[in-house]
A protein has these predicted regions:
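C-terminal subregion of chymotrypsin/trypsin-like serine protease catalytic domains
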Residues: 31-32, 39-41, 83, 111-112, ...
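N-terminal activation segment of mature serine protease catalytic domains
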Residues: 31-81
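Conserved catalytic-core segment of clan PA serine endopeptidases
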Residues: 43-63, 101-157
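Catalytic histidine site
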Residues: 63-109
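Terminal peptide-recognition signature
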Residues: 71, 80, 86, 90, ...
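Short beta->alpha transition motifs characteristic of CBS
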Residues: 91-95, 217, 234-242
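Chymotrypsin/trypsin-fold serine protease catalytic domain
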Residues: 128, 144-212, 241, 245-266
Length: 294
């Protein structure tokens, strides 16, 4: 009898020990938990790189004509052309500070104050900023030297570009026409990209070409195309305008072939060279011999 009680006591004690062990194990699982996942507040380098890759995706909405863009500054709007995936061709006078009476100065505006709007309809579908402005030391009032190339903050991957004709000069009698985002007072619709009526080149100077064209405010800096091609032979600079966009008036376009160094400098700056490491630009046309020494 005493032996059976002893056995039952031993079994009860062992059951208590097993139960205590189970409780200790269970409580141990609650106390000793694995490390919790932590989320970084700031994006990692991999996340930032992924954002850059998204920005550099091809523009599936773009059409070839979207290479012609709208240039928007603090006091003006002009037209420009994408000539490389990070370079915009436009007019010099669009990018200088104005005096108290609207007169043009020689001081180029801050590139950060300029934005490029993409798309040719009434509303832009994208925009990009400007990192640097390359322009000769003349042309701020229009005419000779009135060209400029903008270096963009990022590449516009997948967008079409248009080619400046730098080697073959324009010819008298050659047909040409401008394109721009201008709008005249009697224009029937809002601002959008439009091809303008042009005609034959009537006269040439070393740095300009003269023709009759329909031009509106805002067309400045727009490309002047040789007829039947996408080659740019000039940019819109000066024109005798009235309120009607169908009126063709005497117009002066800045030649591109006279300022090939502007394009070369812009390419070097876009590739990472500091602007102060380049020789200064001059207003002597590239296609003319230097003046004779006295």
């Amino acid at each position: 009898m005493s032996r059976s009680r002893t056995r039952r006591g031993a079994l009860a004690a062992s059951n208590v020990c097993v139960l205590a062990a189970l409780l200790a194990t269970a409580s141990g699982c609650q106390v000793f938990q694995g490390p919790k996942t932590k989320f970084a507040v700031r994006p990692s380098a991999q996340e930032e790189l992924a954002d850059v890759r998204v920005l550099e995706q091809p523009f599936v909405l773009a059409v070839p004509e979207d290479a012609i863009v709208r240039v928007v500054g603090p006091t003006m709007t002009c037209t420009g052309t994408l000539i490389d995936d990070d370079l915009i061709l436009t007019a010099h006078h669009c990018l200088v500070e104005r005096g108290p009476y609207g007169e043009f100065s020689k001081h180029v505006i801050d590139p950060a104050s300029v934005r490029i709007e993409l798309g040719g309809d009434y509303f832009a579908w994208g925009e990009v900023g400007v990192r640097h402005i390359v322009a000769p030391p003349c042309g701020e009032g229009g005419g000779a030297g009135d060209i400029s190339v903008l270096v963009l903050k990022r590449k516009l991957i997948g967008m079409s570009t248009m080619t400046p004709r730098l080697e073959a000069p324009p010819r008298v009698g050659e047909e040409a026409h401008p394109v721009g985002f201008g709008r005249c007072a009697l224009s029937p619709d809002a601002i959008r990209r439009k091809g303008r009526d042009g005609g034959p080149i009537r006269a040439l100077s070393a740095e300009t070409l003269h023709m009759d064209a329909s031009v509106c405010p805002g067309d400045s800096g727009g490309p002047v195309f040789a007829k039947g091609s996408r080659e740019i032979i000039g940019v819109v600079s000066l024109s005798a305008m009235d309120h009607d966009e169908t009126t063709r008036g005497p117009s002066v376009m800045a030649r591109l072939d006279a300022y090939r160094l502007v394009f070369a400098h812009a390419r070097l700056v876009a590739d990472g060279l500091a602007p102060n490491e380049l020789p200064p630009l001059e207003c002597t046309p590239a296609n003319l011999p230097p003046p004779p020494r006295r």
